[in-house]
Amino acid sequence: MNKFDEFIESNEKDLDVDTSTRNSIISMSPVRKTGRKIRSASSNGYRLEHHRTSSAGSMHSQRLMTPTRLNDQDHPLQAKTDARRVVTRHSSVSVPNAMSKRRSLIQPMVVPTTPESQNNLPFGGSVSHSEGSYGIPLESTTVLSSEQAMASGLRRSRNGSSQSVNSMIATTIPTNGVDVSALLQSLATKELELLECKQKIEDLKKQTQHEEQNYTRRARELHELKEQVSKHLDPSLNTPVKNRAFSPVYQNIPLESRTENAGNSSLPSSVSKPKNMGHQSTNQSRSVSPQDIQERRQRDDSSDSSKQSLWSKPLALFNQFDKIIQHEIERTLNWDDSLSGTPEVQEGTPTSNSESSAQQYDNEAPGARQKSPSQGSVSRSLWSFVSDVKAGLLGIEEENDNDVITDNRCDPVYKSDRQHEQKKSTQKITNRGQAEDSGDDSSLNMRKFKTTTKFQKDNAGNNSLTDESGHRTREKKSKRSSNKLSFIGEPDNDNSSVKNSVEMTDF
């Protein structure tokens, strides 16, 4: 040995570092620093040799560990046992630096270990400290792969996480009647949550109210804009109400819409303006205004008046028909009375409309009372109607009165005999029809109209009257003082006719 080798060995002893070549693992102990003795395991078929190279390249015969056969372990990129070196606490070299030798381009991930795990690492199996040597069983020297290291790390992390979760559960779940502070804390949190929810509800309500106000305001603005547009498009809306009837556009508008617009314009408000159908459809969803109430009232009144007009038309027809009949009766009877040629002076006040009309007609000139053929046909049809009405009225009076009237031959005729009276009336009607068709006015079998005043005057004179043909009439005794119409007929085939009285008020 030269001085250089001695210097190296001395430094190795001082630093407790082995600078030998490949396949040498040094386990250093702070207690003993004696010579090295490595127990070989001949059963595995290895020769243990150790050699040291000097600067001169001389080989020193030292213990070497050389495999007896060549295998995959001799590959230069294979992880060797010297890659893992166990370093004590007193060593100056750290563990990552000791394992930082690179054997390939792909370096496995290194998991940091704790001091407790370092004692269990099966790098070289169990390190045996013998006197003066470090015993390492080579058959138990294996290297941990990266997968095993990762699995052990995950297992430890799982254990740690499970322990932390168990500790959290133990703190959150209170014991029965012991952890009151946790209960109070949970109660306070629940109350705070309820208060927050209530505050959110109030905020939402305020927001909805604000949105509703904005909606109503925008709807009002839209309505005003529509009114302005309608004014610009339809100039007839800007014209006064009096001049609208002359505009051609206003004449095409229905009557109902005119009344509605007139009602709206008469309201004492500056905002009241005529509305078209589109505006009314948009305003239906809004609240009812006083204008709408007045419009509805006007419509109801118009509907009531239309209903009343439906009933008034038939009544007007009946009244008109009644007036026509009354006028024709008075005119015909007055004309018959004027044929006698004895006009009489009007005396006193008339007791009814029939007396006044009859006296006025008697005072007229005889030339104005000429009968035309059309008047004859009208009088014939009218007399047939009057005779039917008279027959019905006489039948009722005959049942009530049961009076007996005598004629010139003093033959008693009872009013209860309705068939006899109807027979005579039909005969007289046919005779009058024949006379009128022939055009002989003097031979008409017409009955004369006599009032109570005339009847009293005749009774005061001769108590008898002569008609146009010179026949003598029947004597009469009036039992009633009321205003009645006396129909006096001509004698038919030397047979006296029956005199019947009908009140004018019955018509």
Swiss-Prot record:
Compartment(s) where it occurs, according to its Swiss-Prot or TrEMBL record: Cytoplasm
Disulfides per UniProt: none
Any one GO CC term of the record: cytoplasm
Annotated positions of the Phosphothreonine modification: T239
Residues covered by region (Disordered): 35-62, 255-309, 335-380, 403-507
One Pfam assignment: TDA11
UniProt keywords, alphabetically: Coiled coil, Cytoplasm, Phosphoprotein
Biased composition (Basic residues): 473-482
InterPro entries per record: Tda11
Coiled coil region boundaries: 179-231
Polar residues bias: start-end ranges: 260-290, 335-362, 371-380, 494-507
Signal peptide: none
Residues with Phosphoserine modification: S247, S289
Subcellular location, principal: cytoplasm
Composition-biased stretches (Basic and acidic residues): 293-304, 406-424
Family designation: Belongs to the TDA11 family.
Protein name: Topoisomerase I damage affected protein 11
